[in-house]
Amino acid sequence: MKTMARQYARATTGRGQLYDSVVDTIGNTPCVKINNLAPDGVNLYVKAEFFNPAGSVKDRLAISIIEEAEKRGDLKPGQTVVEATSGNTGIGLAMVCAAKGYPLVITMADSFSIERRKLMRFLGAQVVLTPRAEKGFGMYNKAKELADKNGWFLASQFETSDNADIHERTTAREILSDFKSTQLDYFVTGYGTGGTVTGVARVLREKLPRLKIILSEPENAQIVGSSEQQGRTKNGSPAHSHPAWEPHLIQGWTPDFIPLVLQEAIDKKYYDQLAPVSGTDGIEWAKN
């Protein structure tokens, strides 16, 4: 029995390569089968974005914004980066900015978890809190104010094309590669900025025309499902909070406005169905 145990013991061999920087490990996250939640006859997989080095899909957005800004000359060596975030984008930016030597200032409503602030500060970011009564729109305006006042680089995750573009070039291609021998019938995603659904859908709509794309949002904050237009300024940024938004239980999921990045998915009908989910159900299924 001991011999059999050694024979079948799990082992690894390494990746066979060395990395020049932590940012080079972003992406190529695995699709993992979830064996205990799906109905009979259904194979359910998750794209495990927590395998990214700072723990979320926002690492992709962070490296894309910084590197594309460097290429364009919009971000100068040593220049301070500023962004409004509920957490994960700030954590991803803190990692990328630390690796590349940029100071980072994050604006965040004081309603978001203390753990997120601590992690961003641990990674070297300065965190500026805004009143929760001003919601996401308040921290968004504070970031713009600081950028204009100090000549800082505003990451603009809610408007920049660098957001959806990175998902078009990476996330979508990874999904196609992982499912090249397996039929994929549905792609289900929520939204924050809208970068994932917009970038992935650009590719999957073309390559997998029979695939159904399901967009999820909080049941009590159905800003897309309301069909009410988002007021915008001349540059596409939100002019105010969306009237259909209400506070919900999942932090970072669905801001109180429709980002310009998400607007592309709405205008081009990149999704086939909206799936509202209650906060309590979302938490319960995450635990399961």
What are the residue ranges of the model-derived segments?
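Active-site/ligand-binding loops adjacent to catalytic centers
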Residues: 14, 26-28, 140, 206-288
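Short, small-residue-enriched loops and turns at beta-alpha junctions
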Residues: 52-54, 134-136, 161-165
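Alpha-helix C-terminal capping segments
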Residues: 67-74, 91-103, 121-122, 201-208
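Positively charged, low-complexity intrinsically disordered leader regions
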Residues: 5-79
